[in-house]
Structures are given as C-alpha cells and as structure tokens.
UniProtKB/Swiss-Prot annotation:
This is [Pyruvate dehydrogenase (acetyl-transferring)] kinase isozyme 2, mitochondrial. SUPFAM superfamilies: alpha-ketoacid dehydrogenase kinase, N-terminal domain, ATPase domain of HSP90 chaperone/DNA topoisomerase II/histidine kinase. Expressed in many tissues, with the highest level in heart and skeletal muscle, intermediate levels in brain, kidney, pancreas and liver, and low levels in placenta and lung. GO terms for cellular component: cytosol; mitochondrial matrix; mitochondrion; nucleoplasm; pyruvate dehydrogenase complex. The gene is PDK2. Its EC number is 2.7.11.2. It is an enzyme of class 2 (transferase). Residues 135-364 form the Histidine kinase domain. The modification N6-succinyllysine is found at K376. One of its GO terms (molecular function) is protein kinase activity.
C-alpha cells in the first residue's frame, strides 16, 4: 500500500495498515431512510448506535481507502491528495480507540460523540482539497483519457462514500448530543419526516435569487406547480434530508438563473423559471425548466465531469464558495440524488433552454443508501486499458465527392 507506508513515518499511524486490510474485507451495510428514522425515534438507543457505528464507519472508511490506492501514482503523489489520505487514516484510528470500549459506560458514549464531531470537522474541506489535487495533477501532467476515466469513476464513489459517512455521523451527533434543534424541533437528526418539497424549492430559489440580483441586478421569477397523483388537494411531503434537497436545487437554480439572465441581457422581461413537483407511486420528481439558451448535446456529460471544469481556479483568501471555482456543483448534486437511489438528469435544447429533473424515491422504505464497495469488480475497472473505438470517427473535413479526381 504505497501511500500508507509513507504515512508510517509518523509512529502514531503505524497501526493503520492492519485495520484497513481487516475492515476492507467487509461490505458496507446500507440503511434505508426508514431505518435512519428508527435509529432516531423516541426510543432511540445511543448504545445501539455506538455499537453499530464503531463497526460500520471503519468499514466505509477502509473500503474507500483501499480504492484510492488504485489511482495513478501521479495523482497519489500530489500534496493535496496525500493530505486527504492522512485525514482518512487519522479518522480511522480515532474510531479504533472505541473498538473495545464498554457501551454501558456513559463517559465512553460522550467521548465517542466528541470524536465523531472532531472527525466531521477534520473532513470539512475534503471536497475542495481533493479537487485541488486533481488540478495539481492536470497542471503537471496534462490530460490522459485513461487516467481521466479512472479519476471520474473514483471521485463519484469517493464523494458518495463521504456523503454516507457524514450522514451517519450527523445522525448520531444531532440525536445524542443532548440538545434539540430549536429551528427544526421535529427533525430526526438531519431528516425531516414531513419535508414540504415546495418550501425547500422556495428556500433554494430565494438564496439563488439573492446571488443573482447581487451580480446581475436582475433575476427571473419562479413559477411552481404541484401534481400529487394520490391526493390532488394535499401538498407534497416526503421523508428526506432537506439539506441534501436544498443543495441540489440551489445548484440548479444558480445555473438556470445565470443562463437566463445572460441569454436575455437585452430583454426588459426575463422568462420565469418553472418548477414542477410530481408525486407518483414510486417516484417524486422535480423538474426545473429554464429558457436560458440550452447546451449542445455533446457538452451535457462534460457538465458532470470533474476533469472538464470551465470555471476559473479559486484563489486562496478570495472568499466566496470554494466549490464554485472547481465546477463540482452538478456532479456533487447528482451524487446527493443518487445517494438514496434517485438521480439527476439534464435535458437540453440548444437555442431554447434546459430541463433539469431530480428523481427521488417516494417511499422511505425504497430510499436505501447507495454505497461503493471495494471488490474485484471495482479493482478491474482501474485496470481497464482504453482500446480503439469500434465506430467510425468522422473527420473534421469530410471528403469532397462533388468532383471526380483521377488518383
């Protein structure tokens, strides 16, 4: 394990390799939204949560730590990636301190909650730091199709794993820290058992509108329509994590507003952004439609790529949102949707506008964590060598067949 041995220069990290090898042999245990609710119900047991997390968190950490070692050496050698690796190793060792502790000891439970808060804070900057590592790699070595494909595959899994780990930590710390959230007293941890979808839409719109008004001195209006197939007279509610939904919607609103304002800069009236929320038997779908000029079909997948950001690289100390400069808004938003078996897709008509659709599971029993697992299938993905395509590639200058030429 190349990166682990480098970390062994620090004696305090010497136990990491054996823990990584041990826990990476187990597959993560995905939880459903209903199970999260049960963990945090009025009969929630801190000892049960402690016993589960001290086993499950190392499994999730070790699985992704094994996988990161499959990245190209050139990526692993960047200072930013090495820093992220050191955070993961330290967090794993922090949890190992509790493997043999007694769940009946209240001091142990309190110390465990404090340790989880420390781990969560340590990992606050994982996304921008890993993004910086990708930039360091690109600046030094340029673009390589095979490496790019592996990095895209890994980062989707790495960031999804991070979302899941933070979800577990947040649920435990929010429920068992001995206090209630005064702003959201009915929330169970970070989950709202009765999340009003349209209210989250409005909150995300209002924040994006503030930014749009600040930079463009104008912003499009919002039109919301709800279709509840089960009961047309009832507003649409679901069991969900409002912060996850807000993250997705805020990113989509920012993109839609910018496209709308910039494509209608000579118009006195901006076309509104239309949002439709539809609840069916299986899916809850949210469609956001703008008239911002659209995107060519060939560029759609690039919008979800970590390697093709057109945004300027963020400069330290300039303020603002760090992710804005890395162009990670859409790919991370899609991962939030996929985390509980949903999806985020874009449908664009160049010259007109774009529809963005968020698909979520309508039932809490169907909303089950989507988790990466380190196994032979994942390993083989990194060993794949890009071969020549089996479709003709059109030349940039098609052959002129209008005139007969003697060869």
């Amino acid at each position: 394990m190349r990166w682990v041995w480098a970390l062994l220069k620090n004696a305090s990290l010497a136990g990491a390799p054996k823990y990584i090898e041990h826990f990476s042999k187990f597959s993560p245990s995905p939880l459903s939204m209903k199970q999260f609710l049960d963990f945090g119900s009025s009969n929630a047991c801190e000892k049960t949560s402690f016993t589960f997390l001290r086993q499950e968190l190392p499994v999730r950490l070790a699985n992704i730590m094994k996988e990161i070692n499959l990245l190209p050496d050139r990526v692993l050698s960047t200072p930013s990636v090495q820093l992220v690796q050191s955070w993961y190793v330290q967090s794993l060792l922090d949890i190992m301190e509790f493997l043999d502790k007694d769940p009946e000891d209240h001091r142990t439970l309190s110390q465990f909650t404090d340790a989880l808060v420390t781990i969560r804070n340590r990992h606050n900057d994982v996304v921008p730091t890993m993004a910086q590592g990708v930039l360091e790699y690109k600046d030094t070595y340029g673009d390589d199709p095979v490496s790019n494909q592996n990095i895209q595959y890994f980062l989707d899994r790495f960031y999804l794993s991070r979302i899941s780990i933070r979800m577990l930590i947040n649920q435990h710390t929010l429920i068992f820290d001995g206090s209630t959230n005064p702003a959201h007293p009915k929330h169970i941890g970070s989950i709202d058992p009765n999340c009003n979808v349209s209210e989250v839409v409005k909150d995300a719109y209002d924040m994006a509108k503030l930014l749009c008004d600040k930079y463009y001195m104008a912003s499009p209006d919002l039109e919301i329509q709800e279709i509840n197939a089960a009961n047309s007279k009832q507003p649409i509610h679901m069991v969900y994590v409002p912060s996850h939904l807000y993250h997705m919607l805020f990113e989509l609103f920012k993109n839609a507003m910018r496209a709308t304002v910039e494509s209608h800069e000579s118009s006195l009236i901006l076309p509104p952004i239309k949002v439709m929320v539809a609840l069916g038997e299986e899916d809850l779908s949210i469609k956001m439609s703008d008239r911002g000029g659209g995107v060519p079909l060939r560029k759609i997948e690039r919008l979800f790529s970590y390697m093709y950001s057109t945004a300027p690289t963020p400069q330290p100390g300039t303020g603002g949102t760090p992710l804005a400069g890395f162009g990670y808004g859409l790919p991370i938003s899609r991962l939030y949707a996929k985390y509980f078996q949903g999806d985020l897709q874009l449908f664009s008509m160049e010259g007109f506008g774009t529809d963005a659709v968020i698909y979520l599971k309508a039932l809490s029993t169907d909303s089950v964590e989507r988790l990466p697992v380190y196994n032979k299938s994942a390993w083989r993905h990194y060993q794949t060598i890009q071969e020549a395509g089996d479709w003709c590639v059109p030349s940039t200058e098609p052959k002129n067949t209008s005139t007969y030429r003697v060869s």
